[in-house]
Each structure stands twice: as C-alpha cells, then as structure tokens.
Amino acid sequence: IEFTGSTWFTSLVGGTDRPAPERVDIPNTVQADLREYQRRGVDWLFFMSRNNLGAVLADDMGLGKTLQLLTLLAVEAEQGVRTGPTLVVAPTSVVGNWAREAGRFTPGMQVVVHHGPGRLHGFELMRACEEADLVVTSYGIINRDHKDLAHVRWDHVVLDEAQAIKNVGTQSSKSVRALPARHRIALTGTPIENKLSELRSLLDLSLIHI
C-alpha cells in the first residue's frame, strides 16, 4: 500500500520507501511466544507510543490484547524509555485477571492492584504507584479515587473494554479523561456496537489533546 500525504505525515511514518512501524526486539523478560499478529500489534503500539499518538487496539476478544500491552511495557522498560508507571482501568470482573496475566507473562513486573476496601489512599497510594510498573484498578474505583490517582504522573493510561465509557457524559469517562498521562491506549473487542460514532468516542478517549 502506498501512502501520500503531508510532509509531517511522511516524516511520521518514516517515508514511503520503508515500512512503518519497524520491528522491535522482545526482551526475555516476556515469558511468552507471541504470534505474528501480536508481534505486529506490539510494533504498532510502540510506534504510536514513541510518537505520542493515542492508540485504539481493537483485536477480537481472546486474541491477546493484554499480552500485547504487557509486552509493550516490557519493551519500553528494556529500552529505558519508560517515564512513569502505567495505569490500567478495567471492568471489575477482569481486574484480577490483569494481575494474573502480568505474573504469568511478565513476572518481573511490579504490579499494584488498587481495588477493594483495603486499598491505599493519599500519600501511601502515590508512593505505591510511583514504585510500581503497573497499577490496575476498575472504572468504579476511578470514580471514587480519581483525585488521588490524578496526583500521579502516568506514562500510559490504558482503558480496557473501553467501549464501557464511550459516553463522554458519564462520571467514569470524565474521571479517566482528567488523569494526567503521556500516552493513552484504548483496548476493546467491540469498537463499534451500534453506530459509527462509537468509534469516534474511543478515538476521543485515546487522543484527548488532538
């Protein structure tokens, strides 16, 4: 496929004479054999992250979006380009799954699960987040603790099952938009459920500053 566009676009994709994004090296801290489409997904996520372009990863359910995201974080840690912790906001039902998958695929990653009645607050929460590689919480907790979490300068804010907050008027949507982050990623297996405007909502979540 040949692309034509502005000078900025040509510079962004590296020119039309070579493919973009380029292949990244997967570090041995990732305990998984990625399929080719997952490798391409990691390459693309890394490309978008390094260019500060928000991303929507919309692979079907069960195709390994969690693994691709964890691998991206491992790649950035290996290359020394991580600028802070990553926050994953997910439905309550999969918060525990994120911690389990991180322990399985990236066992060296420091993970904090911010959920439940015994969760941290205030300075203790900030310190725990800043010492972590990955913090996982739910949309419900974001509504309650968004002021505390907004004091952390996140490298990535990742929205799992992002279609759950496609309505910009909901408190969850407002809370995640208010979180400071260098880069944002929306993960969803159903980017369009009823109408095309839903895709626009997901793009707005990941490209807040554009």
Feature map (PLM): residue ranges:
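ASCE P-loop NTPase motor core, strongest for the SF2 helicase catalytic module
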Residues: 2-208
